[in-house]
């Protein structure tokens, strides 16, 4: 890829349109509605809404797109995604089956995403670093996906979010026909960003209950639900939980209590509402954790610091890893640089969660 090979398109270009249709009525809808409250939102399309059925959200109709395309879509209407998953598939459907022009379609870009995920100036400043990351990636599918993620971030165009075909399941990357990055039976798993236990249930299910999990969740409310899950499911012998964030120092830190639908945890001293929580350096727990086989890090932009705080254990055990890289724009180059510094011999791939090309993740094999 010759960086850049696309025409820059910022969120402000939505203002060129006199009307907006949002697409998606799931958990992100409220956030997108708030971000676009000053715009003329005329309808909300959702594929899960039954044909002929109409619901209301803040006096805006929610309907199946087949019922609303003719009524609400014209050349002066933009479609803005209000859903995280399936943005690529939705955009392809809009172009192919509803004949909506590509320039009318915008990816999800609520204020939170716009602030942290899209930053064209930062990307242009770090094109050389992105070229270096591209060279680090271990297969052509990862490189192609990186190219498209950069195009997407510069254009707000979900048609660039074509999935990496090597993602064959949640936390599963296909390196070759016989080699996968994935959690396995008997693995010792680090679950960074355990939330309320959804990932715990996933790991237990996909290892037939034969794994040991060390969970880290800083928010008290989430931690209590996680604790309740472990007790209710009688997982105490297999799951150890820490009411702590992961970082590069073991200390108390100020963490934002301003959580969205995804329970964001922004270690950011500039947020208005704070909680003091424990931050744990993983290397300081080496006497408590027998070994590490698989690491999942999804900790709202603190992934690079958690890696720095675990470098001794990562060098020693060489675990497979899934490291989220979508919370901050510079995750795309900062995280692989940290990984490469810890162990330059590890293979690095770039993928995403199934049907969520919007959220890049590094896989380490």
Where does each model-flagged region fall?
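Phosphate/nucleotide-binding beta-alpha loop and adjacent structural elements of enzyme active sites
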Residues: 1-41, 47-365
């Amino acid at each position: 890829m010759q960086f850049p090979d696309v025409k820059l398109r910022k969120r402000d270009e939505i203002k060129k349109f006199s009307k907006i249709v949002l697409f998606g009525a799931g958990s992100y809808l409220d956030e997108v509605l708030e971000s676009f409250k000053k715009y003329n939102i005329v309808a909300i399309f959702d594929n899960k809404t039954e044909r002929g059925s109409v619901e209301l959200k803040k006096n805006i109709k929610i309907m199946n797109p087949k019922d609303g395309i003719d009524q609400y879509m014209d050349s002066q209407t933009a479609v803005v995604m209000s859903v995280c998953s399936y943005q690529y598939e939705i955009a392809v459907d809009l172009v192919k089956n509803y004949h909506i022009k590509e320039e009318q379609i915008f990816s999800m870009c609520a204020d939170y995403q716009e602030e942290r995920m899209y930053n064209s100036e930062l990307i242009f400043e770090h094109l050389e670093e992105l070229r270096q990351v591209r060279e680090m990636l271990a297969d052509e599918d990862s490189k192609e996906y990186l190219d498209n993620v950069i195009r997407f971030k510069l254009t707000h165009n979900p048609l660039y979010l074509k999935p990496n075909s090597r993602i064959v399941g949640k936390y599963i990357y296909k390196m070759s026909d016989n080699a996968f990055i994935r959690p396995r039976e008997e693995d010792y798993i680090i679950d960074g960003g355990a939330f309320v236990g959804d990932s715990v249930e996933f790991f237990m299910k996909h290892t037939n209950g034969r794994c040991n999990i060390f969970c880290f969740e800083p928010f008290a409310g989430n931690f209590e639900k996680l604790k309740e899950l472990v007790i209710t499911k009688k997982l105490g012998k297999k799951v150890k939980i820490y009411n702590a964030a992961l970082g590069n120092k073991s200390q108390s830190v100020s963490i934002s209590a301003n959580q969205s639908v995804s329970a964001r945890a922004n270690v950011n001293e500039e947020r208005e509402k704070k909680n003091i929580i424990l931050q744990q350096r993983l290397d300081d727990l080496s006497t408590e954790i027998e070994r590490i086989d698989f690491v999942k890090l999804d900790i709202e932009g603190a992934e690079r610091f958690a890696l720095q705080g675990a470098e001794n254990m990562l060098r020693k055990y060489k675990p497979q890893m899934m490291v989220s890289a979508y919370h901050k724009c510079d995750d795309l180059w900062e995280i692989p640089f940290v990984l490469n510094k810890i162990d330059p011999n590890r293979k690095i791939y770039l993928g995403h969660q199934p049907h969520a090309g919007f959220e890049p993740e590094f896989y380490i094999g």
